[in-house]
């Protein structure tokens, strides 16, 4: 593999990289030898171990030239089963400070459906440089491998060829095969965590959302100096949408932190199987919405008995809305927090004024995208902790299915339409997209 440096005198100078790990030798990128009257810079390195450095020259490493990328895109908002299509476009050579990515898996989340419909506040960039009409490349979460990068002589970054990364900024387009992105928009995965691809692809959005909601409103993380988990009373959390990816992460983190959980789910033919699955993750109690609202079952009394006099429940997590959420709020102790991070029922949330007046209830919203903009360093620490828990088997990823994308653009568009129909009907596992090599 041949690389090229572009030095200040604008002379293109070849550098050769030998990738044999048994015979790696390196020389400083500023080391020169003279052949005739021309300076020649040489460096020997293995791309899989190539690290960034600061130099007065621009340096390329790995794969940096133009390639063809394939992507799932839309030209206008609308029905996800109808507006998505596949698109091929030329990905130009890297610019200064950019990183070349090969996406391994791109995750589909409920918010992505809202993005396609045009009802989500965070939107992908409208690209006018990749086709005859403006297009938006879909995908907010996924895992990618670094195939190359260009150093600009000013920035020293922390990546090397072969590193796996997740997205550190929203709507970067993870449903494509390749991308050139700024290194500042990426988060490296710790190599010593040994995560497999499915774990890595589902790590950047849902587990952090669960972590923050369990930490920021009622401090339940025992590592927090202000954690109420260290007090005399056992802490409890109640949540709806407990079978969602966020809900499952909440269950597992709460179990790890010694916090009890009461989990509400929609009734279905396989409800016993679902309850068993959530309990295997650490759920203390699982109820359907019908069971929760039933007066015949005297559920409120049962929940109070579960919590007991030695416990308290100050946190409720809501991603649904509707009547069930109001009933959840009524069960909270004094100074309770109702945190809303979704509204799948698409109905208004009505809460009795008495909860605010006499019980000092606080109702707030949470969106991870807002939090990450102001907590970059804390996010890095959190991601490492989540990666470690995942590697230790203490935080399991949701059940996933990999959908292979290949063939003509028409074939890919048809497959994506089928995937969106399945998601719309609530069938199947969490979908991960993978572009097959051609």
Which residues does each predicted region cover?
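Rossmann-fold dehydrogenase core element
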Residues: 336-339, 351-396
